[in-house]
């Protein structure tokens, strides 16, 4: 009985280590990955993700698309800098067709553009949200 329990325990530890190795190697491929999107009320709109580059604290551009096709964008600035997940705030995201705050709309997608280096290159991450 003791032998069977030790074997099961060893198998689970190996599975956990393999899962951890795969998940950490996958996460390091992207320059950034969105971990959580929340809508603060009434303003601003918060976008949080884990930093994968040394560009922590730099402004990013956030574009919002609503189901009716309206789009808007805003420059977001960092609230925190460091190796913890940075929180960016986008205070004036507006629906360009009606000039109303997008928080009253159902958001179909967010497109996040973040500088890769000091050059004009950028990396875009598109995610779904509702």
From Swiss-Prot:
Induction: Expression is up-regulated at later stages of infection. Its main location: secreted. Residues 1-29 form the signal peptide. A motif (RxLR) lies at residues 45-48. It is found in: Secreted; Host cytoplasm; Host nucleus. Keywords: Glycoprotein, Host cytoplasm, Host nucleus, Secreted, Signal, Virulence. GO terms for cellular component: extracellular region; host cell cytoplasm; host cell nucleus. Glycans are attached at residue 36. It comes from the Eukaryota. Disulfide bonds: none annotated. Effector that acts as a broad suppressor of cell death to interrupt plant immunity. Inhibits cell death induced by cell death-inducing proteins, including the PAMP elicitor INF1 from P.infestans. Belongs to the RxLR effector family. Has a conserved RxLR motif that acts to carry the protein into the host cell cytoplasm. Lacks the 'so-called' EER motif, which is found closely behind the RxLR motif in most of RxLR effector family members, but the presence of an EER motif is not always essential for the translocation of every RxLR effector into host cells, or for inducing a hypersensitive response. This is Secreted RxLR effector protein 68.
């Amino acid at each position: 009985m003791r032998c069977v329990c030790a074997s099961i325990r060893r198998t689970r530890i190996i599975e956990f280590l393999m899962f951890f190795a795969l998940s950490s190697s996958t996460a390091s491929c992207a320059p950034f990955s969105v971990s959580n999107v929340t809508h603060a009320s009434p303003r601003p709109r918060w976008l949080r993700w884990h930093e994968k580059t040394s560009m922590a604290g730099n402004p990013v551009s956030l574009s919002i698309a609503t189901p009716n096709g309206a789009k808007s964008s805003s420059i977001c600035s960092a609230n925190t800098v460091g190796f913890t997940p940075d929180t960016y705030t986008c205070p004036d995201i507006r629906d360009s067709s009606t000039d109303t705050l997008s928080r009253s709309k159902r958001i179909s997608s967010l497109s996040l553009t973040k500088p890769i280096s000091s050059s004009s290159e950028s990396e875009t991450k598109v995610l779904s949200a509702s």
